[in-house]
Amino acid sequence: MKKIIWISSYPKSGNTWIRYFLSNYFFNKKKEESSFGILNKIDKFPPNKYLENIVDKKFLEKNPFNISKYWEKVQSEIVKSDNEYIFLKNHNALLTIEGNDFTNEIYSLGAIYLVRDPRDVVVSYSNFLRNLDINQTINRVTNKNLICHISKKNSLDIEILGSWKLNYISWRDGVKKIPKIIIRYEDLIYNTFETKLKIINFLSKLLYCKVDIDQLNFSISQSDFNRLKNIENIHGFHKNENNFFNSGKTKQWTQILSKEQIAIIENEFKEEMLELGYINL
């Protein structure tokens, strides 16, 4: 039985960017010029095609957290796939909801967790959502209650996020038997080759395959942020009216957030930001 490799993160932390990189590395061996269609090689969890035949929509409408009752069932079907590799994009926290584990070592081979400075997450997330201003986005990112995010385009696309902190800690500490690697968004920008090589080394050990440096370099060039932004400007991103690849920069928060807003984020996430090198004592 094959197992799942998770590409997990809090929203706006580089998940789709890495998904594009990995899609080219593992599924574009002919080294053809790629566009956003290649992202279809890596589904977002939970994939609609597995849910639509087993879900009671009224059951979910009554309580979106009931999506947790389908997590294991969907994963048990996904691992039957004929695909050589099974990667899944995910924003869910690694939690147990009403007795339902998000995942376990039976279905999961490993996980890449992408983390980004929460001050920049707030800026990027607010820009992406559009209907929330900075203060409202800070409230969402710091909210200690579990939050269900339901896609406007697909009522079955339900994610249980938690706060930025809870999401990060859940993947850092949860299900010890699942091998994990934590990757900072900032390292993808400033140490691109070394960081992406680190990811491929991690995956190569899980998948028992050799590192292909030529394929790595090709995949890095294909997933160059400016290249993806240009493609989006010309063709759009899956008909998404919001810009998905906005700026890709770090420390945008220094120009946008007020001192009060910065203080709220840093006070709420002090321990984790220290751990990740985002603030100093």
Annotated model-derived regions:
Residues 1-183, 247-251, 260-281:
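PAPS-dependent sulfotransferase catalytic domain
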Residues 29-52, 87, 176-255, 259, ...:
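The conserved 3'-phosphoadenosine-5'-phosphosulfate
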